[in-house]
C-alpha cells in the first residue's frame, strides 16, 4: 500500500494551501511550476510549510477536508506544534476492529 501525505504550502502573501499526495517532492515541484492546483497559480514564491505521512488515501482525504475547515490561526498551530497535528490525526483515525 502506498503511503499518503498531507502537506501545507505557504504562498507569498502568507496564505496556507492544504493538499494530499503520495509524493510530496513531486507535488511541490508541480505547484512551483504552475502545473499543480489552480489556487496556487500566480501566488508568488511558494514554500513547503508542513508535510506528514498520514496513512491511506481515505484517511488523507478526511484529514485534508478537516484542515480546510480550520481557521488560519488553527492551521498555523498545526505547522508550529507537532502535538496539535497529532491530536487532529488521532481524532480522525478509525479504530481497527478485530474479528475473534
Curated annotation (Swiss-Prot):
UniProt cross-references to InterPro entries, sorted A to Z: GIY-YIG_endonuc (IPR000305), GIY-YIG_endonuc_sf (IPR035901), UPF0213_domain (IPR050190), UPF0213_GIY-YIG_endonuc (IPR022992)
Family annotation (Pfam families): GIY-YIG
CDD domains: GIY-YIG_UPF0213
Domain GIY-YIG: 2-77
SUPFAM superfamilies assigned: GIY-YIG endonuclease (SSF82771)
Family according to the record: Belongs to the UPF0213 family.
Name the record gives this protein: UPF0213 protein YhbQ
Native species: Salmonella arizonae (strain ATCC BAA-731 / CDC346-86 / RSK2980)
Gene label: yhbQ
Amino acid at each position: 500500500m502506498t503511503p499518503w501525505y498531507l502537506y501545507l504550502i505557504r504562498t507569498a502573501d502568507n496564505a496556507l494551501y492544504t493538499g494530499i499526495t503520495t509524493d510530496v517532492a513531486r507535488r511541490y515541484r508541480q505547484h512551483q511550476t504552475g502545473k499543480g492546483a489552480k489556487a496556487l497559480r500566480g501566488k508568488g514564491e511558494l514554500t513547503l510549510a508542513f508535510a506528514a505521512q498520514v496513512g491511506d488515501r481515505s484517511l488523507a482525504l478526511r484529514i485534508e477536508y478537516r484542515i480546510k475547515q480550520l481557521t488560519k490561526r488553527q492551521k498555523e498551530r498545526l505547522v508550529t506544534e507537532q502535538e496539535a497535528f497529532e491530536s487532529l490525526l488521532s481524532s480522525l483515525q478509525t479504530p481497527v476492529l478485530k474479528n475473534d
